Amino acid sequence: VCCRQLVRAFIQAGGKLIVWHGGSDAALSVNSTIEYMTNMEKSVGAENAAASTRFYVAPGVDHCEGGVGEDKTDLLTALDQWVTKGIAPATLTAQRVDANGAVILTLPLCQYPQCPRYIGPANNAANDKLRSSYACTSPGVEPKLEI
């Protein structure tokens, strides 16, 4: 109860909150975070939640980092732009880097419940590593594919 009151007060005061969760986190279930965000939205109202919060699930990412997914995302800059310039984040960019820090793959990091879907040309190994080859889609909605 106390946490809900704190979050409600934070949002009512104009606070901004970005929540990120690794989709393959074995330590903390993403389902618990989905439930928390759903309850928070009910508590503060859908309009207030949409104006003050963003929720991202990083597919294939373990607890905080690692896994098969793209675990590098600049959430701090997104939050700073939102707070200082009023530019609310939408789709962010998630990256996978090699041991030397070189980017080897970029994908869109979609707002939950959307997820990235490949829309690029078939049988093109170079394009499957490009953010532009993916679109955020809602569950059950098929994206328009490039042919």
Go through each PLM region and give its residues:
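C-terminal His-loop and adjacent cap/lid subdomain of alpha/beta-hydrolase
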Residues: 1-147
